[in-house]
Every structure is written in structure tokens, then in C-alpha cells.
Amino acid sequence: MAQFFKAKPNSSKQLSAKLSLNVDQLDHLGAGIAQYQGKVVFIPGALPDETVTVQLTEQKKNYARAKLIKVDAQSPERVEPECPHYHTCGGCDLQHMSLSGQREHKEAALLDIMAKFAGTEGGALSPALTGEGWHYRRRARLATLFDKNTKHLSLGFRAASSSNVVPISQCQVLAKPLSDLIVPFAKLLNQLSAKASLGHLELIAADNGHFAVLRITKALNDKDLAKLSAFAEQHQIYICLQDNEGQFQGVGVELVLPVYQLLDENAQSDAVSLSFTPGNFVQVNSQINKAMVAQAMDWLAPAPDERILDLFCGMGNFSLPLAKMGADVIGVEGVAEMVSQARVNAKANNLDKLTFYHGDLSADLSLEPWMGKIDKLLLDPARAGAFESLQWLKKMKPRKVLYVSCNPASLARDSTVLLERGYRLQRLGLIDMFPQTHHIEAMALFELTK
């Protein structure tokens, strides 16, 4: 028998009266933290040492969330955001804080979470890897928004915590040549007869040119292709189309893959070049990626003929430089397409001391052909971390473990596994891969002591 209940009003979502709060610190997502009636209050947009007027938007038993109404007393770290879209676009969330303040916060947050969960309090950080604060991204994916009423197509990014597309005319963290293409591309796409069926637009700046990948849901006619080809020639950019099956087709020219170099770019004999398809993952900050790889080589110190395992190796960002320095490298990656690209890159660089495998690194690894004694281990996992992979340390017994992390929480959790297995944290440093955002990347070096 069906029973019907009248839904209770959700009072937890109602706005409170305006409150004046003092902000103490930032949380790991870049929101200000204040106290109110025994609860922690999270306030996006607020900074430490500020007095702010807010309204509570959500109340739970132990915490609340608030909307920033006004800053009554400013922090000396507060600055005017440079991007006109900052308050609506969901891409950046710390443009209101000075770059030096952002980095101090990220280093403090990294130390705090490692001390809290990995018991590493009292340690000092290695110098942070830092670079340009603006126009550092070599890659971005722009969403399309087609208005059925006006028949107009807009390009933009998603709003924070939303699927809504915010139309933009520029991006202050995207490489300047790519940012300058946003308005011309929007104008071009509105001239296409297929504009209602276009998907996202990906822009890429590589060492061998600028690229645009346009997602299409149906084949374009000859007139649309001619317009794209003319645009590509005018703006000196490679354009390729990606269809529903994920296949890529060059517009006007043969398909060209973007390429970037690592190690010494001035001495070609020491450099390695990596090509990638638009579907492959690459680090978006070219300057910091080069510094990160160089630091990894310095910290791990690969020697000729050492057996080094590179887990979550991608298309060879670390594997190729390790092999270039003489090590016998085994790379393992969970995405088959990236394993294929890693093999292509190894062959293109004439590196034969490299073997790549495709496999699920969260599964039972005991019977994998590459499992066994190694000299050193490099890990570069996704945000979920490498907890499952580290359960097999006893079979691998590396003297050194270099962990490159894009999530301090999973790094701290995984560090406990290493510490329990007899490893000691020797070095820890911030990698500021994403200025103007709360995202924290880090590099940690562990050495076996038992």
C-alpha cells in the first residue's frame, strides 16, 4: 500500500541574517574559515585576518557554509582579480589573493596535512617550484553553449559547482596566443551551418605550433570545412576534428600531433621530445612541468643500468628522461592509448631501455610480468593516489621512492604506508602547477632505512 508524506521545508538552505565574522585561515579548497556559535564556517572568497559580512547558506551539525557579502577589513594579501570573468567563471578561485600569499598558504597546507596524517611534523620544505602566475596554461577545453532562441553559440567555462557555461572573451591563465583566439573562434563557429551540433573546443600550445581540436557530433559539409581551413591558415594554427568515435581528422592538412621537449632544449642530444594526441593527459603548465621533471631526475638520481619502475607513467613524461640518463625503465599505465603513445615516443627518441605495460594498478599486481625487485620507484598517480600499488612494496623493495602528487590528502595517506614499511621522508616540496587556484601539487622523496 502506497504511503504519502508531505516533504518538510529544507531550512538548512535558507539564508541567515547578515553576520560579521573574523576569518582565521584558509581551508584546503581556498575558502576562508571562521567560527560562529561553535561551528566552523566556510566562506569562499574570504582571506585570513579579514573581517567580513556574510550570510549563512547551509548549516550542518558541526559546520556551516556562507556567502561573502562584503569585506569590512581587508587582508594585506587581498588584490584585485585580473580577469573580468573571475566572479562567474569556475576556473580560478584565488585571484583575489596575492601570488606570494597563495604560495605561502599552499606550503603551509602541505606541511599541515603531512604532519596531521603522516606524522612528519617539524620537517622543512625544499624550495617550491614556481613560475609565471599568469598565462601559464598550454591547454584548455572550452565548452560550447548554443542558444536555440537567438541561434548564437558562445564559448566559455563551466561555472563553479555547476554545469552552466559562462561565456568568456579571454582567459588570464591560458597562454596568451590561445586566449587571443577565443573571440575569433567564437565568431568563426557562429558562421558554421553545423554550429548547433558542435561540442567542446580544445586549445593547445605546443613546441611545434598551436592546435585546436573541435568536437563534432556529425560530419561537416564542404563549406564549413573551407571556413575552418581558411581560419587555420589565417591564424597559423592546426585544426583537427574529433568525431563521436574519438577519431581525429586534420582540417586542410595531414593530422599533426603536438610535441613538447624535456631536459636540455639547447643541447638537442640531451633533449627528449614527446608527442601526444588531444586525448592524452599532459601537464598543462609547461614551465613547471620541465622544472618538475628536472627536479625528479635530481632527487631520484638515476644511474646507468638501474632498474626503475615508473607507475602511472602516462605517455612517458618521466620514463623517457629516466631512460635518457641510462636507467632500465619499466613504465606502467592504466590507459591503453597512453601506453601506445609512450611506445611511440620511446621509438621516436631512439630509447631502447624502456618497456611499457598496460595494467590496472589498483588490482592484484603479484602476477604482473614486471613485478619484482627494483632499485627505485617513481609514482605519479591521479588524485586518488597509489594506496593499492604501494601494498606491493615488499616484492619491489626499492631503495628510493619518488612520489609526485596532485592531491596532498592522498599523498599523506600513502605516506603512512611507506613509513610503516621502513621508509623515511627525505625531501618534500610544493609544485605550484596551478597559480590562481587552490590546487596543490607536491613532490616527496622517501628512502629505505631498514
Curated annotation (Swiss-Prot):
Coiled-coil regions, chain positions: none
GO biological process, one term: rRNA base methylation
Pfam families in the record: TRAM, tRNA_U5-meth_tr
Database matches in SUPFAM superfamilies: Nucleic acid-binding proteins, S-adenosyl-L-methionine-dependent methyltransferases
Chemical reaction(s) catalysed: uridine(1939) in 23S rRNA + S-adenosyl-L-methionine = 5-methyluridine(1939) in 23S rRNA + S-adenosyl-L-homocysteine + H(+)
Amino-acid positions noted as binding [4Fe-4S] cluster in the UniProt annotation, renumbered to this chain: C83, C89, C92, C171
EC number annotated for this UniProt entry: 2.1.1.190
Keyword field: 4Fe-4S, Iron, Iron-sulfur, Metal-binding, Methyltransferase, rRNA processing, S-adenosyl-L-methionine, Transferase
Domain of life: Bacteria
Residue ranges occupied by any TRAM domain in the UniProt entry: 12-70
Active site residues per record: C406
MF annotations from Gene Ontology: 4 iron, 4 sulfur cluster binding; iron ion binding; RNA binding; rRNA (uridine-C5-)-methyltransferase activity
Enzyme class: transferase
Residues the entry annotates as binding S-adenosyl-L-methionine: Q283, F312, N317, E333, D360, D380
Assigned protein family: Belongs to the class I-like SAM-binding methyltransferase superfamily. RNA M5U methyltransferase family. RlmD subfamily.
Function (record text): Catalyzes the formation of 5-methyl-uridine at position 1939 (m5U1939) in 23S rRNA.
Protein name: 23S rRNA (uracil(1939)-C(5))-methyltransferase RlmD
